[in-house]
Structures are given as structure tokens and as C-alpha cells.
């Protein structure tokens, strides 16, 4: 079985894929390794993720999330290996996750709106050209906060 995660700081959406296709989906607390330490991540994985998994062994985990570049992503990868125990763990950015979902192994331009919005060119394997995200303070175009700000601003004019 394959476990796929799409995570931000607030929530993580999980998808369990078996031989017949999608088996189930579930949601847990967000896992952003830039802000969470090893113990906090291990706690979410053991208390919220493991209880949702079937008895059948998970062979592969693909985790796409905020804060997953560099050392924080490596630490998350280690925790996923330790807690879930799959053969393969891959931890990548949400932009790679969106690109793979949209294009598979074909090239294309991918963009994410919301907290930490960004965009890039995907060559079918990697993001090779990327607009850097300005984070949730300056780069939240399309997020709930941004849309609410525009709505209130327009209503008060």
C-alpha cells in the first residue's frame, strides 16, 4: 500500500492507495517540520496517523508539505521511516506534489495560491525554475486571510 500526504502547518490530508485504487482518505494535524520538532512530529504520526492505517503493510510514503526543504525535510523523512516503517519515503515540497498531481511525468507550469503561494516550471521530474515564496506574511495571495481582507476592504468602502 502507498500512503500520500499533502501537508501545511494547520492540517494534513492523507490518501491511502492499494491495488484497487484509493482505499481511503483521512485528515490529521498539520506537519510542518520547519516549525515542529522530532517529538511533536512523532506524536502526530503515532497518535493520529498510525490509528488510521490498515493492518496491511505500507510500502511507500510520499509526503508533500510546507517546510520540507533541507534539514527539516530530512528529519521528517527519518520520523516517517521510524514510525510507519515503509521501504520508501519521499519528502518534497507542496509545489512538487502539485506538479506531479497535475502533470505526472510531463512538463508544465504549476502554481499554488494561498499561504506561501508560489509557482515554478516542472520538467517532468523536478521544479527547475521557481518563483520564491514570500511566506504567509507577504505571499498569501488567495489564502483565507487575503480573501477576507479584500472582502472587508471592499465592503467598508
What are these regions (language model features)?
Residues 127-157:
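Glycine-rich phosphate-binding loop plus the immediately following alpha-helix
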Residues 96-97, 102:
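Helical "lid/coupling" subdomains associated with nucleotide-phosphate turnover
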Residues 2-43, 56-57, 127-128, 133-134:
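Short glycine-rich, Thr/Ser-proximal phosphate-binding strand/loop in the N-terminal lobe
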Residues 78-81, 121-122, 127:
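Active-site phosphate-binding/coordination module
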Residues 2-6, 60-62, 90, 108-112:
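Short glycine-aspartate micro-motif
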Residues 49-91, 102-103:
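Short beta-strand-loop/turn "lid" adjacent to the catalytic site in phosphate-handling enzymes
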Amino acid at each position: 500500500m502507498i500512503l500520500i500526504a499533502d501537508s501545511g502547518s494547520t492540517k494534513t490530508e492523507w490518501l491511502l492507495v492499494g491495488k484497487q485504487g484509493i482505499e481511503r482518505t483521512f485528515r490529521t494535524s498539520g506537519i510542518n517540520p520547519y516549525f515542529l520538532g522530532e517529538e511533536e512530529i512523532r506524536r502526530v504520526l503515532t497518535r493520529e496517523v498510525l490509528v488510521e492505517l490498515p493492518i496491511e503493510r505500507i510500502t511507500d510514503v510520499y509526503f508533500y508539505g510546507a517546510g520540507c526543504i533541507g534539514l527539516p525535510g530530512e528529519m521528517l523523512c527519518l520520523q516517517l521511516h521510524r514510525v510507519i516503517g515503509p521501504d520508501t519515503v519521499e519528502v518534497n515540497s507542496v509545489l512538487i506534489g502539485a506538479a506531479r498531481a497535475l502533470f505526472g511525468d510531463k512538463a508544465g507550469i504549476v502554481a499554488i495560491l494561498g499561504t506561501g503561494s508560489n509557482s515554478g516550471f516542472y520538467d517532468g521530474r523536478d521544479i527547475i525554475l521557481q518563483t520564491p515564496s514570500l511566506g504567509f506574511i507577504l505571499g498569501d495571495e488567495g489564502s483565507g486571510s487575503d480573501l477576507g481582507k479584500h472582502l472587508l476592504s471592499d465592503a467598508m468602502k
